[in-house]
A protein has these predicted regions:
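Alpha/beta hydrolase fold serine-hydrolase catalytic domain that processes acyl esters and thioesters
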Residues: 1-26, 31, 35-43, 49-122, ...
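Gly/Ala-rich beta-loop-alpha elbow adjacent to hydrolase catalytic centers
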Residues: 176-181, 185
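Short glycine-enriched nucleophile-adjacent loop
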Residues: 185-194
Length: 403
């Protein structure tokens, strides 16, 4: 029997207004998940549109032929959007201050919006990492950079939109995000205008990565520590990257392993998440990941990240989907490009690919069938088990030719 999740929550509690049943942690996760929907051309910064109207426009748009530049939603994303958009609880929520920016030069993937769910109450949602390589490169930059472009933009965005002027005098703000979005929410609150912080009620991070700097050493921690709520599934690798903020709530999930990062798999019990105990295997993965990261000097991490994404971009990939869908010709291009990388950096790239694929094998259960198919196709083409032998053979030949 399938456990209840955010979708069943809306299905069975969507007829209750926020006056009937006050805003809770499940509502917060729902808004962060809705921020992954591509509202470009539908929502705007200056104007507003109800979630009901926006849902109808997105569904109509995605029912036709694919549109270049528009990210098509997964079936479960559209289901949540449709249910929420036509519910009493969420339908009249207004989307405003919508921004969606992708800057390859600055390595910034940033999307944020306000969900005004009651008069004078707004949830500020930061989107997590999308399918773009720009977004993933920005994630990897967190391994060595004090801050990344998206974090700086998050602070600017909160200062711009969480105003304390006469028009917004009585507005209270809830801020949050899933995955990288949770990290952006926390960083943004810590670095935005002081006047904006005073208007914030809660800050939510749903399996968001931490920071290189210990969180308690950051300025303003004392101001926000009682407002901050962090949630991680019982198997969490993402939420414990670097120095994790803190562990407030461990959530049960009906997925396995790394796929518990998917907020749609989190088990809901009424107006709360079902509690769980952190998985021992998750602790092992965290320890291995941190050991691997700490083994790389900070000054080498940047060159490693640049080398990794240069290889992917030179193969013609702009997204993770492009990478997973590479045909044999594309795979050969990747291998050829990697041969020219210094052996130390090349070994690190192989290590992280093997690590992710290995965890994928152990974790696969109830996930989007399209993702499973893409991963299987890529593994079949790349033949990762033989990858090191391929590199070693080709490198030996290259060295002999040089001598």
């Amino acid at each position: 029997m399938r456990q209840e999740n955010v979708t069943t929550y809306v299905r069975f509690r969507g007829d209750l207004s926020f006056k009937d049943s006050p805003f809770n942690e499940i509502d917060a996760l729902i808004f962060t998940l809705l921020s992954y929907i591509d509202f470009k051309g539908i929502a705007s910064y200056e104007g507003s549109i109800t979630l009901r109207e926006a849902s109808e426009k997105v569904i109509a748009l995605e029912s036709g032929d694919p549109i270049e530049g528009h990210r098509k939603s997964a079936p479960h994303e559209l289901e949540l959007l449709d249910l929420a958009g036509h519910s009493k609880r969420f339908g009249d929520t207004e989307i405003t201050y919508f921004v969606d920016e992708l800057d390859k030069k600055e390595v910034r993937q940033f999307c944020a919006m306000h969900f005004v769910f009651e008069r004078n109450k707004s949830f500020v949602a930061f989107r997590g990492t999308d399918d773009t390589l720009v977004g993933w490169k920005e994630n990897f930059q967190m391994l060595y950079a004090k801050n990344v472009a998206g974090q700086i933009r998050a602070a600017e965005y909160l200062s711009e939109t969480c105003k304390n002027d006469l028009k917004h005098l009585f507005v209270k703000y809830y801020v949050g995000g899933h995955s990288k979005g949770g990290n952006l929410a926390i960083y943004g609150v810590l670095h935005c205008d002081e006047s904006a912080i005073k208007k914030m009620v809660k800050i939510y991070s749903f399996d968001g990565p931490g920071f290189e700097q210990p969180f308690e050493e950051m300025p303003r921690y004392q101001e926000i520590k009682d407002k901050l709520m962090t949630y991680t599934p019982k198997f969490s690798a993402f939420g414990f990257c670097l120095d994790h903020v803190r562990l407030d709530h461990t959530v049960d999930s009906f997925n396995n392993g790394l796929y518990q990062h998917d907020g749609y798999s989190w088990i809901v019990d009424g107006t709360h998440f079902k509690d769980a105990v952190r998985d021992e295997e998750s602790k092992r993965v965290e320890a291995n990941f941190k050991e691997w990261v700490h083994s790389i000097p900070i000054d080498h991490r940047e060159s490693f990240v640049n080398a990794l994404f240069d290889v992917l971009e030179e193969s013609g990939c702009n997204s993770v989907s492009d990478f997973l869908n590479l045909n044999m010709s594309g795979v050969i291009t990747v291998i050829k490009n990697m041969i020219n990388i210094p052996s130390e950096e090349r070994d690190l790239i192989i290590h992280i690919i093997l690590f992710i694929i290995n965890e994928d094998r152990k974790s696969k259960q109830t996930v989007d069938s399209r993702i499973v198919e893409k991963v299987e196709n890529f593994k079949e083409n790349l033949a990762l088990e033989n990858l090191k032998n391929v590199f070693n053979t080709k490198t030996d030949k290259t060295e002999k030719a040089k001598s």
